[in-house]
Amino acid sequence: MVEFKFEVKARDAAGRIGKLEVNGKKIETPAIMPVINPKQLTVTPKELKEMGFGIIITNSYIIYKTPELREKALEVGIHRLLDYDGIIEVDSGSFQLMRYGGVDVTNREIVEFQERIGVDIGTFLDIPTPPDAPREKAEEDLRITLERAKEAEEIKGIAMNAAVQGSTYPDLRTYAARKLSEMNFEIHPIGAVVPLMESYRYRDLVDVVIASKQGLRSDRPVHLFGAGHPMIFALAVAMGIDLFDSASYALYAKDDRYLTPEGTKHLSELEYFPCSCPVCSRYTPRELREMPKEERTRLLALHNLWVIREELNRVKQAIKEGELWRLVDERARSHPKLYAAYKRLLEYQDYLEKNEPITKASAFFKVSEESLKWPIVQRAKARAERVKAKFPETINHPIFGEIPKYLSLSYPFAQSEGEEDFTIEKPGKREVRNYVMAVAEYQFGEGTREAFKDAFVELSRKTGMPRQIKAKGKHLATFRAEDGLLTLGIEGAKRLHEILPFPRMRVVVDEDAEPFARKGKNVFAKFVIDADENIRPYDEVLIVNRNDELLATGQTLLNGRELKLFQSGLAVKVRRGVEK
């Protein structure tokens, strides 16, 4: 039986911090798998585990075709062969197929071999179609890949990759992704993209990734095959990539190449190391240049691994802080082709908006003209226009232009920084209710202002800002200090439930979860049976049963589509239940 779980813990842009568990072993994503060549170990798997790499990838085809490795792997298993107790993923020989045109093994043979040697995550023998291949070849390769996927699905007894192919034809990528999503696989790599990255065709890479993501199930992690340079991590994660692999740490080291988050330097160019990893803290560039080749290669490989790990941590911290777009913007300026890819990504507004959180831990900073195209800005402008029809009194915002006056206390309008300051005016007692009604219309959708038309709004004695919202002695909502949006009380939730037709704002849970939700307990993904597809990450939602009876209110971590798909992890952090 396959033991595999994936859940989302935090998110920003289309990126996410997740927890992946396979066979009782856990890693946090985004994660990178250092590539291990069992014939040539620059850094041992055991050392990689000590450095914090909880997952590695090696090539099952090389092991299969090397008699001594094959015999030992069959005898003791791949974990003992490599002396590594973390998660081991394997490729199938597809890379050799793309590079050299052929492999001497069948799909069934390699899948069965992977299971026999005890890998954690296997890969069937897909056909990687290189970029710009003739359409007919891409279609035929994909037909064979999907046939092999079906065969692998029928015989597999381990967690398995199902790679999305289709060359540089977006429609084929989306088609492949949809077909594979219908099958029983655990992870979806996006394959045959190394040639795009090697030739700096990052703009085309964006098209391939987004086309694939649009067809894939959102509850499965996505692996960008062959992507291991830190300069691309922020952009790739913002697109929705969860897993990477890198042979570059060792291959570059052999050529005296030194990785940085902004690009690659040759050791001969460096007088100073711009890094404080254990290698760069101990040696100077000159000292490394004077070392024997083998020792120098090993130390450069270690540095490259440290900088890869550091950049992934930087990306994860940016997600936690709601700053991933700022990091993407910064990294994109390290190369013109990466900058072009960043601009291309911002053209996919529909895809990005569905994954963009409704609120963030950090203020919006206008750091570039491109930042005005971030989905949080585009959404805010669109919603403000809708609110303006009901609350026509406007003020001029230096970043967002003309906005309804009564949204001026709320995210992202109040929590933003540009070249010019935006002065926030404290609301007067006579108009403070309008602020609440306008924010409801902005946050919950058209018509929801009616739920607060008789509200009494308490102002903070300290700041003069709206805080508690009540009506007829009952608590409706809280006007949050951190972002000027509303957290619903159960009475406010009841009013919205009466106003809004099903399924708006709803998360429907099954009978098992119902008594817990009523008592204010969190809702987990496996108990969700339906949801409003317009729900966005960190939205306030109404939790109901199959009969649309209100059970609770809370904040969701997932968007509407994800709520219906995920089977692991937290779905809604419940704030109030009808019985508590």
Swiss-Prot record:
Residues annotated to bind substrate: D126, A192
Annotated residues for binding of Zn(2+): C275, C277, C280
UniProt pathway: tRNA modification; archaeosine-tRNA biosynthesis
Classification via SMART domains: PUA (SM00359)
Cofactor(s) needed by this chain: Zn(2+)
Active site: D91 (nucleophile)
The EC number(s) this enzyme carries: 2.4.2.48
Catalytic activity reported: guanosine(15) in tRNA + 7-cyano-7-deazaguanine = 7-cyano-7-carbaguanosine(15) in tRNA + guanine
GO biological process, one term: tRNA wobble guanine modification
Function per UniProt: Exchanges the guanine residue with 7-cyano-7-deazaguanine (preQ0) at position 15 in the dihydrouridine loop (D-loop) of archaeal tRNAs.
NCBIfam families assigned: arcsn_tRNA_tgt (TIGR00432), tgt_general (TIGR00449), unchar_dom_2 (TIGR00451)
Family under the similarity heading: Belongs to the archaeosine tRNA-ribosyltransferase family.
Name the record gives this protein: tRNA-guanine(15) transglycosylase
Gene that this sequence comes from: tgtA
